[in-house]
Amino acid sequence: HPEIPPNTGNVIRLTANTATDLHLVEPLGFRMDDRELKRAGLDYHEYARVAVHRDFAACRAALDRPVPRRWFAFTTTGATSVYDVRFTPGDALVFGCETSGLPEDIVAQFAPAARVRIPMRPGVRSLNLGNAVAVAVYEAWRQNDLRGAS
């Protein structure tokens, strides 16, 4: 449920640069033709693969066809560091909205080992959503030999 158009625009640019897909779950805090969304994504929108799903169940059903994926929920309360996960191609990385993160009912669908956190200093609430996605995507890509990078 992204709320801030520039964050999603930045993630669109990230997905274009890493050949990853972006799946957004409604409700969105903006329209997909939002000026700030387009501005943040610059001219990368045409290179990004973006899908919008009505809810998390629909997203999960769409991505688990034809073969189920491994799913990881990114949360500040996760038990597993992003640097301890062994990512494989096709893994799904799930992030919450900017103001409140993933809802508890979504987090509860993930085994404790699949609840992932990005290490931060104590007493700091969270990273910016776009930055958190970048940290996770680049770590997963690095572990897979930056396949497709120049």
Where are these regions (language model features)?
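Post-transcriptional modification and biogenesis factors for structured RNAs
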Residues: H1-S150
